[in-house]
Amino acid sequence: MSARWRWLGPTAALLAVGLLVLMVFSGQVRESRQLVRFQAVGVMPEAPAEIDRVELRAAAGQWMFVRGPGGWRTARDGQPLPGATTTSLDDSIKFMHVSAPVRVMERDEWATSGLREFGLDPPGYTAILYRGSTPVLGAEFGAPNPQKVLQYMKLQGRDQVYLMSRFVGEEWEKALRAAAGG
């Protein structure tokens, strides 16, 4: 074996180590193109942790929940909520922050048929989210689409009707059922 071939392995290893050292000192790590950066594209720009009060309204009644150091409680008597209800509230709020509408219909698209066709006049239930005493978002939920995978939603103070993934409304419905004792 010639001297040239004997030095090939150690030279390649030294070059590889040199490249790693260069990457460490330059701070330029190649970004994987397989990973997608998280972007909150939901209808609520506020971070879920900022929401400290939730009001739920439905035909069966109205419920208010407050978040404190010990977790979610009923506003009326301060009783802590069961774990499943707490999870439903937390997940519902997160979904409002991260789940983008599948479709947004402007007023001229739905005005001729009216909101009743989408189950929004009156809405099936409403969730109002607060930061302190300030309402951040009021979401009125209507009927699911014919395939039952999407649901119509309207935000209070806006003219658009949103078509949201059904799991968003289902999580609010779990919280409503728990609040109503069912």
Predicted regions and their residues:
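A short-motif feature that recognizes glycine-rich, charge-decorated loops
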Residues: 1-182
